[in-house]
From Swiss-Prot:
The keyword Chloroplast does not apply. It comes from the Bacteria. GO terms for molecular function: 23S rRNA (guanine(2445)-N(2))-methyltransferase activity; RNA binding; rRNA (guanine-N7-)-methyltransferase activity. It catalyses: guanosine(2445) in 23S rRNA + S-adenosyl-L-methionine = N(2)-methylguanosine(2445) in 23S rRNA + S-adenosyl-L-homocysteine + H(+); guanosine(2069) in 23S rRNA + S-adenosyl-L-methionine = N(2)-methylguanosine(2069) in 23S rRNA + S-adenosyl-L-homocysteine + H(+). Specifically methylates the guanine in position 2445 (m2G2445) and the guanine in position 2069 (m7G2069) of 23S rRNA. Pfam families: Methyltrans_SAM, RlmL_1st, THUMP, UPF0020. GO terms for cellular component: cytoplasm. Its EC number is 2.1.1.173, 2.1.1.264. PANTHER family: RIBOSOMAL RNA LARGE SUBUNIT METHYLTRANSFERASE K/L, RIBOSOMAL RNA LARGE SUBUNIT METHYLTRANSFERASE K_L. The gene is rlmL. Its main location: cytoplasm. Belongs to the methyltransferase superfamily. RlmKL family. This is Ribosomal RNA large subunit methyltransferase K/L. It is found in: Cytoplasm.
Amino acid sequence: MNSLFASTARGLEELLKSELEALGAHDCKIVQGGVHFQGDDRLMYQSLLWSRLASRILLPLNEFKVYSDLDLYLGVQAIDWPSIFGVDKTFAVHFSGVNDEIRNSQYGALKVKDAIVDSFTRKMDQRPTVAKQQPDIRVNVFLQRDMASVALDLSGEGLHQRGYRDLTGQAPLKENLAAAIIQRSGWQPGTPMVDPMCGSGTLLIEAAMMASDRAPGLHRGHWGFTAWNAFNEALWRELTTEAQVRARRGLLETSSRFFGSDIDRRVIEMARANARRAGVAELITFNANDISKLVNPLPEGPVGTVISNPPYGERLESEPALIALHNMFGRMMKTAFGGWRLSLFSASPELLSCLQLRADREFKAKNGPLDCVQKNYQLTANPQGAGGALVAEDYANRLRKNVKKLDKWAKQQGIECYRLYDADLPDYNVAVDRYGSKVVVQEYAPPKTIDPQKARQRLFDVINATLAVLELPSNQLVLKTRERQKGKNQYEKLAQKGEFLLVSEYNAKLWVNLTDYLDTGLFLDHRIARQMLGKMSQGKDFLNLFAYTGTASVHAGLGGARSTTTVDMSRTYLEWAEKNLRANGLTGQQHRLIQADCLSWLSNTDEQFDVIFIDPPTFSNSKRMETTFDVQRDHLVLMKELKRLLRRKGTIMFSNNKRGFQMDLAGIAALGLEAKEITALTQSEDFARNRQIHNCWLVTHSQEEK
């Protein structure tokens, strides 16, 4: 009897144990990441040929304590290596684990290699060659704390490499994980299977191999035991011949049929090629189709299983489309696949909730580093595909109410960009802004006390409801997460799309970018302030400090300003401001753009202006600014500098976003200035619920100064 170890992905150990026992293994014991078992040579070869779930089959050779690198060397050298493989064979060492003495796996592998080579040279005065690619013999060493285990890897390459998949689509499933997903899905051989997002076809091919009784190792061209001195070639030939006979018979006898589709034609061609190499092409029908065109291939029966590993998305921007996809997919399942089973494997349980289906079984497993879940559903017939109650119903009702009121108001105002929802309900802490035909949903970062998975689920519910209420295609919704920006983060790109959208605000045309930055280039809450500046600027010299994308300069220019001067520290935003000015025909030397630290520029200029707009940050500590700036602490210093530039009958519009800001009116008076708060006048209908989003003041020379 041989003592053997079969490794597998975490979470699949119980399934693997059952599989090995069905093959005839004895004394199976589960450990994390695998199963120890006993078996004769026939069982050993059968496990290699027939296990659909094992990653590797290892033959343990020695186990010993390791307190130093010398212990490791001597423990490996104690094995009679020339009795295991010939000196003319190549070998490789796979070493995993570290302890206090062996702190680097590469160093550990080097010591093992030296011990094996020295074992040969001492006994034979010859040495075998190390080969990194497809070695004849693969030695596996696992070090955990002070215990090392040395084993012969009988698999060679991982057993998930069946030999049929040369090319793959993006993010493939390993074949042994795919086999586990199928076994857990409840699918029965003899019944049909559909994978509507099949990629390179792994799930369908693995199921077809099961249905046709085809051994998963039948197509492998390289093994880790053929150069082993104890290799029983006759027994191996007998077992593979038997497997070939079973595969031919199974292909003829199976009644299972398989159907796969994917939007990517290139990947579908790969899937077809993979199925041909696996010997099951005649059982599988592949089509290049968008999932929205999915139909039941067997509407008259029999019923079967829909199984898939749908996309889950790694970037925030992809989530609206994925939420819409899962929502649509859930409706399609109820409409066209009543009576079937559905099984989905995903790294995002939140996306699976968008199906609006109730799972009857759930499993957990790892897909590489990802924690994944598999959910099984029994689909009931529902020709209309009607779902249950709309998710986030309170939010949906509030959004619907706001839209009815604000869409009409915005049309009357002549604006295309406005806020539809602003954390109106505490459970749904998002802002929803309309920009022409597009909508931006910004999630305010939840407190650290909120469970991240619950917060993500609630966000997905919001997106689902937003798409439904606004009847919006998913590619028209942009998702962002708003957090406090520090230092240069406010200027850094979130994406690299470079997609600009031209929108209308009263008589101005303004460019916005909804994807590349945290902000879009247009502060919606300052809309009325910009309109006021336009009316104030006719025939005047206008200065815009901390100008951002220069939208206030555009309104001043369109209002008939004699000149506009736009100052900001960011080259990116100044180029954007120039683009905005140009879109409104505001070109020429009278429209200046200056890249500078606004505070330094203010201290060093003696120019005079009639209208000054300043909207400074609440706090800034940019490296390009020599000192920090706090709007509450420093607003008098700012006003003192602005007074120098303000003509006698001029006006400063001063705005900021600091909640609870207190204007030092006594200090203002001491400077010879007067300040009047106009916050209420600058707040529009779409920000009626958020009276503290900004505060705004008009500052002029006092009567005595004039």
